[in-house]
Amino acid sequence: MDDDFEEVGGRFRRFRRRLKKDWSQLWSDLSDPKQMRFPWPINTPLEVYEQVGAERFDPSSHRYQMPFFWKTLAVPGTPSWALLVCIIESTFALICFLAVMLHYAIFLPWCEVYSKPLMVFFLTALQYAIFYSFKVIFMISIVERNARLLRLQLFFQYATCVFLLLDAAFALAADFGGYNEELIYCNKNPLLIRFVAIISLIFLFVQMFLRIITVQVYNFMWDVRKFRKSLNNSKWRYRKRVHFTYCSIMQEDFKNERLQNKTKSVESRFRDGQEEILKQIQRKQNVTNISIAPDEPFDEAQLPQNARSISTLSTTPSNSATVSSPLGKRKHHTVSVSSKKMRDNEGKKVKVSRRKPGGIKVQLEVDYETARLLFSPKKNGRIPNVSVEEVDMEFDEDDDSHPEEHEPLV
């Protein structure tokens, strides 16, 4: 028997030590003033500081200090003060609940009518049940530092003040107002009910001050939550800006590289085309070239009768207001005569016109018969302002009496 008693006593002592240890650990965690700060991450960019607004989250602000007007130094609003408020409210409710239960336990068995006293008893018990339910939520919000649950507790504290006033007014009116309070409380002068009503009126003002303390704790919890959310949004916004800047720079580099590659490919293709044309020209031999150049001089004395050579056809603008093309079409535009002089193959000075901008030079490869037809004045007429320069080419004097055809040059 003694061993069982010692075993039970040892269990109770161990339970008490564990409870004391857990309580001291919880209290030290809730009352630590070092938690009254807004933790900024290491190496936070300056843009994130500016976006969050460091001046809005100052731990030394009066919004996070206790309303102890009798103290000269500020007291930070740690969650331990909210826990103290919860303990005070629960103690008051426990005292009132025990007083009401004791009153009905004493006088209810001797009551003649049970309907009204039982209804008042159950309503009072329901009020205290709801009150303690919200006190449990209050404790959870303090330990977990949940700002939303603490905000719900602030609304309930308003309701507590209202119901304290209503209960006290109802009890005092029934006691001192001449109403037959025996039908409700089963006693002529219920001292316990009167005691509960008086301390409820007193606690009404205490409850308002306790709510102010809870508001200060709630302000810090809510601002910590808002700070974390704002910091997270700013970090993601900064990461997106850096990523988009990097993507735009890479896109510009890729665009410039693609443009350079395209320019190089066009240049290489143009150079290959020129080289291919030059190779084709070099492979050709014994060809008849007819070049139309606007800057060659005109001399009718050089017009051959018979020649077997390469001929050059050039147009020379006249002094008139119109200029004729090699095909006989007249173009109506003014041409200024240049005073530049050149010498022909015989050493004679000839006047040539200034080269027009945008002149072209066309080389045609034709056979002998086509060349005769081009230079025949009987079929085509006289080509105005055209000079023929013979290199090594012979034609028959009679164009009509030469029936055979020559092979075209290759």
Curated annotation (Swiss-Prot):
Domain of life: Eukaryota
Location of the region described as Disordered in the Swiss-Prot/TrEMBL record: 310-333
Bias type Polar residues, positions: 310-325
Listed name of the protein: Uncharacterized protein K01B6.3
Source organism: Caenorhabditis elegans
